[in-house]
From Swiss-Prot:
This is Frataxin, mitochondrial. It is an enzyme of class 1 (oxidoreductase). It comes from Caenorhabditis elegans. PROSITE patterns: FRATAXIN_1 (PS01344), FRATAXIN_2 (PS50810). GO terms for molecular function: 2 iron, 2 sulfur cluster binding; ferric iron binding; ferrous iron binding; ferroxidase activity; iron chaperone activity. GO terms for cellular component: mitochondrion. Monomer. Oligomer.
Length: 136
């Protein structure tokens, strides 16, 4: 029983067999945060959003204040762990690891960052045209 739990846990958490250098991680994380920041700005220009909708990106931290009723998303680099951390007012905190193909994946359930953002922002804005897949 214990070996099955440990084996399943190991399988679930081992998405990438490649170890990224610190420089590769920093480049990927910075690029991801920049693309996300640009897309959130595009969302503000292209979709009906709250007057409180605000995007700020500085020093490895992207903050998106959606509205008073929804709350604030914070997406940031966690360089010591080579991760991107997300704090979502809808789904809570998550830690994403970089996969070989350049996608950020949450080890606990295998969901990728773009998939979670698609689901949550499509619900928030009631619009299926939201698509983070090219921006993460």
């Amino acid at each position: 029983m214990l070996s099955t739990i440990l084996r399943n846990n190991f399988v679930r958490r081992s998405f990438s067999s490649r170890i990224f250098s610190q420089n590769e991680y920093e480049t990927a994380a910075d690029s991801t945060l920049e693309r996300l920041s640009d897309y959130f700005d595009q969302i503000a220009d292209s979709f009906p959003v709250s007057e409180q909708f605000d995007v700020s990106h500085a020093m490895g931290v992207l903050t998106v204040n959606v509205s008073k009723s929804v709350g604030t998303y914070v997406i940031n680099k966690q360089s010591p762990n080579k991760q991107i951390w997300l704090s979502s007012p809808m789904s809570g905190p998550k830690r994403y690891d970089l996969e070989e193909e350049g996608k950020w994946t949450y080890a606990h359930d295998g969901e990728q960052l773009d998939s979670l953002l698609n689901r949550e922002f499509r619900k928030i804005l009631a619009d299926d045209r939201i698509d983070f897949s090219r921006h993460v």
